[in-house]
Amino acid sequence: MEDAIYVAVNQDVRESKKTLLWALKNLQVKKIFLLHVHLPFSLTTSSSRLEQSEIDAIQDSELNTSVNSLYKYRDICINKGVNEKDVDTSMISGHDVGEGIVELIYQNIITNLVMGAAADPHYSRGMSITSRKAEYVSQHAPHSCKIWFICKGKLIKQRERSFYLGNPSDSFSEFSTSAEKPISKGRRRDEEEEPESPKEHPGWILEPEESPKKGRKETIEKSKSNESDEDPRLEDFKCPISMEIMRDPHVAADGFTYEAEEFRKWLRSGGRTSPKTNKPLENHNLVPNHTLRIIIKDWLEKNPNYKR
């Protein structure tokens, strides 16, 4: 079965309906999840001059509006032929949509995401992303997540899935018309999906091909532990603070991944800037990097002789 498709939707159905319809038309949808980040009103009795009961009523009303919107999106999916049991929803409350979407990606180990992209009302193919939330997601989502960025029902950017652990934004691809081509009646599929590729999973990592050793003056016999020591991915597995392989990787506000306890020690010792960039941290929150944890676990199982 193909990986589930996750679609990030707004409270206003008019804004996200075209994004959802694009996913239903262009991707092979067997299981679909509707994601929503609810932004509660920040009201206090002192600033609003309202009673707490009135504030609670307003916030409950807004939450109900978000829930009802998800029901409307679900109905759209069902009307387009998706079985009701194959439509699910996931909602969290937060103060930033981009951060909320990234948190949902990590929580659900999402590998296929469709979301709105441009804030510019004048759509053009190949246009740059102007939405701050889309830019944030493109930079902070794990590389195992393929992302389609949609504007007014059209694909404008696509970030391919990969297992390279550098900057997520490096894996962007420009607009491709092939993803917009209609497909045979009764079928929906992603035209940009590579044929005959192995089914992707966030817990998988591809082994690097052996490079030819023509003319190299290297020792022929190497132990398995030495080979694993030379694996370039090791640098991505290590915590920037302790330089040891991470067991509990978490993403900090600077966008880099750290061993959770090492980062907390950094804060307890008085650190207020990023250990990587030395720039002030916007907050001290940590988001679990489930995908990287799985990749590291698999790598260690394949390299049992690695000296930690």
Swiss-Prot record:
Its EC number is 2.3.2.27. One of its GO terms (molecular function) is ubiquitin-protein transferase activity. One of its GO terms (biological process) is protein ubiquitination. CDD domains: RING-Ubox_WDSUB1-like (cd16655), USP_STK_Ubox_N (cd01989). Keywords: Transferase, Ubl conjugation pathway. Pfam families: U-box. Residues 210-227 have a biased composition (Basic and acidic residues). Transmembrane segments: none annotated. It catalyses: S-ubiquitinyl-[E2 ubiquitin-conjugating enzyme]-L-cysteine + [acceptor protein]-L-lysine = [E2 ubiquitin-conjugating enzyme]-L-cysteine + N(6)-ubiquitinyl-[acceptor protein]-L-lysine. Pathway: Protein modification; protein ubiquitination. Residues 172-235 are annotated as: Disordered. Coiled coil: none annotated. It is an enzyme of class 2 (transferase). Functions as an E3 ubiquitin ligase. PANTHER family: OS02G0152300 PROTEIN (PTHR45647), U-BOX DOMAIN-CONTAINING PROTEIN 33 (PTHR45647:SF100). This is U-box domain-containing protein 54. It comes from Arabidopsis thaliana. The gene is PUB54.
